[in-house]
């Protein structure tokens, strides 16, 4: 049985999410997988990549062939270099930086918060109409 490591598509139209799976090469793209070893979300910035390195190393060692896309992902995470014994095993994976916590401006600050206009009450609206009719 020829085993491949490839992507299994999830998500909606124009919003793909993929799982990195090990499956028989004759199975359908979204068919039954032998094992799920990672996730790939290409629409996020930077792309979200999560690979169970130990399991990827195991499947590569027993002869599973990665697809072109998965091979590129494994090179980014450094798993391919680790398997082949090449330099650069730390990978080039970029992660999101943590956002700073919101800090409200102090009372003596020069920053003026945006004004929130309240809706006019019914009586004020009626007075405004009366003034416009009197002016005519």
UniProtKB/Swiss-Prot annotation:
<dbReference type="InterPro" id="IPR020592">
    <property type="entry name" value="Ribosomal_bS16_CS"/>
</dbReference>
<dbReference type="GO" id="GO:0003735">
    <property type="term" value="F:structural constituent of ribosome"/>
</dbReference>
<dbReference type="GO" id="GO:0005737">
    <property type="term" value="C:cytoplasm"/>
</dbReference>
<dbReference type="Pfam" id="PF00886">
    <property type="entry name" value="Ribosomal_S16"/>
</dbReference>
<dbReference type="GO" id="GO:0015935">
    <property type="term" value="C:small ribosomal subunit"/>
</dbReference>
<keyword id="KW-0689">Ribosomal protein</keyword>
<dbReference type="InterPro" id="IPR000307">
    <property type="entry name" value="Ribosomal_bS16"/>
</dbReference>
<dbReference type="InterPro" id="IPR023803">
    <property type="entry name" value="Ribosomal_bS16_dom_sf"/>
</dbReference>
<protein>
    <recommendedName>
        <fullName>Small ribosomal subunit protein bS16</fullName>
    </recommendedName>
</protein>
<comment type="similarity">
    <text>Belongs to the bacterial ribosomal protein bS16 family.</text>
</comment>
<keyword id="KW-0687">Ribonucleoprotein</keyword>
<dbReference type="GO" id="GO:0006412">
    <property type="term" value="P:translation"/>
</dbReference>
